[in-house]
Curated annotation (Swiss-Prot):
<keyword id="KW-0699">rRNA-binding</keyword>
<dbReference type="GO" id="GO:0022625">
    <property type="term" value="C:cytosolic large ribosomal subunit"/>
</dbReference>
<dbReference type="Pfam" id="PF00861">
    <property type="entry name" value="Ribosomal_L18p"/>
</dbReference>
<keyword id="KW-0694">RNA-binding</keyword>
<dbReference type="GO" id="GO:0003735">
    <property type="term" value="F:structural constituent of ribosome"/>
</dbReference>
<comment type="function">
    <text>This is one of the proteins that bind and probably mediate the attachment of the 5S RNA into the large ribosomal subunit, where it forms part of the central protuberance.</text>
</comment>
<dbReference type="GO" id="GO:0006412">
    <property type="term" value="P:translation"/>
</dbReference>
<dbReference type="InterPro" id="IPR004389">
    <property type="entry name" value="Ribosomal_uL18_bac-type"/>
</dbReference>
<keyword id="KW-0689">Ribosomal protein</keyword>
<feature type="compositionally biased region" description="Basic residues">
    <location>
        <begin position="10"/>
        <end position="20"/>
    </location>
</feature>
<keyword id="KW-0687">Ribonucleoprotein</keyword>
<comment type="subunit">
    <text>Part of the 50S ribosomal subunit; part of the 5S rRNA/L5/L18/L25 subcomplex. Contacts the 5S and 23S rRNAs.</text>
</comment>
<feature type="region of interest" description="Disordered">
    <location>
        <begin position="1"/>
        <end position="22"/>
    </location>
</feature>
<comment type="similarity">
    <text>Belongs to the universal ribosomal protein uL18 family.</text>
</comment>
<protein>
    <recommendedName>
        <fullName>Large ribosomal subunit protein uL18</fullName>
    </recommendedName>
</protein>
<dbReference type="InterPro" id="IPR005484">
    <property type="entry name" value="Ribosomal_uL18_bac/euk"/>
</dbReference>
<dbReference type="GO" id="GO:0008097">
    <property type="term" value="F:5S rRNA binding"/>
</dbReference>
Length: 120
């Protein structure tokens, strides 16, 4: 019987392939993106030490958005994570799109983070 593979399982396989080649260091940590149907999350991670340096999501109380699942909310999360990273002294990052296509909410978050001062 032919079964359809889950989109999330395929994304996880793509992410695992990328993560085998991509790692964040203390000098250049990894900007990781996770997208759900309702929310979007971003973390800046130092993989060498296993530490999250900064994070932001649409669940944050200081982020006032009407809708949490659209590109405008993702852009605000990108600005917020870039601001929190600059407070910790992080300016250069490696972008990890998490196996998602670089389009829509993921692209909006990345563009907003770039405009707010992160370099990748």
């Amino acid at each position: 019987m032919i079964t359809k593979t889950s989109k999330n399982a395929a994304r996880q396989k793509r992410h695992a392939r990328v993560r085998a080649k991509l790692s964040g260091t203390a000098e250049r940590p990894r900007l990781n993106v996770f997208r759900s149907n309702k929310h979007i999350y971003a973390q800046i991670i130092d993989d060498v030490n296993g530490v999250t340096l900064a994070s932001a999501s649409t669940l944050d109380k200081d982020l006032n958005v009407e809708s949490t699942g659209d590109s405008a909310a993702a852009a605000k999360v990108g600005e917020l994570v870039a601001k929190r990273a600059s407070e910790k002294g992080v300016s250069d990052v490696v972008f990890d799109r998490g196996g998602y296509l670089y389009h829509g909410r993921v692209k909006a978050l990345a563009d907003a983070a770039r405009e707010a001062g992160l370099k990748f």
